[in-house]
Amino acid sequence: MIQQELIDDSEEVARIINSEWMVDGELQHAAFTLNPNETYLSVNRTSIDSYEDDVRSFVASHERFQFDKGMFYKVALLSVSDVRSIKVFIEDDQLLNINVEVEPRSTHTKSHAGIFVRYGSNNIIPSREVPEDLAQKVVSTDMILQDVRWELLELAKLQTNSL
């Protein structure tokens, strides 16, 4: 496995918002949902020099991420430090050893990054089986990811930008 540089805790990342993720002007937790077989949630690093161009280019070519007839786009800003501090508990308030990490993913654009949810070194992927010791705690991958989604929603600062 190739070791990548860590993103500094002082950075912010931005999740580009699909218009379907807004209801009555409010961001919904669906904005932070992994699709089946996805290993990470796509975000962009705001500190990278190509950030604004990367995001505008993406939004311009994907109408569902445009607001007010293509005049604006929205992003949910997240502090990397806050994302890494997310904790997952199960019903009896037992803390699970789940790590939420933000890592560079320059596969699409220079500013692209991913938010990974892991148990040990295993990525938590929607609707997949959890490791055996987690299964004994009667917890599913979907329950873990749901907790993380709600936490991300609480941490997110919505920002509107001109296209």
State where each predicted segment sits.
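Signature of Gram-negative chaperone-usher
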Residues: 14-18
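Short aromatic-glycine-(Arg/Gly/Cys) micro-motifs in beta-strand/loop hairpins
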Residues: 20-34
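Conserved NAD+-utilizing ADP-ribose enzyme module
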Residues: 1-10, 33-41, 45-163
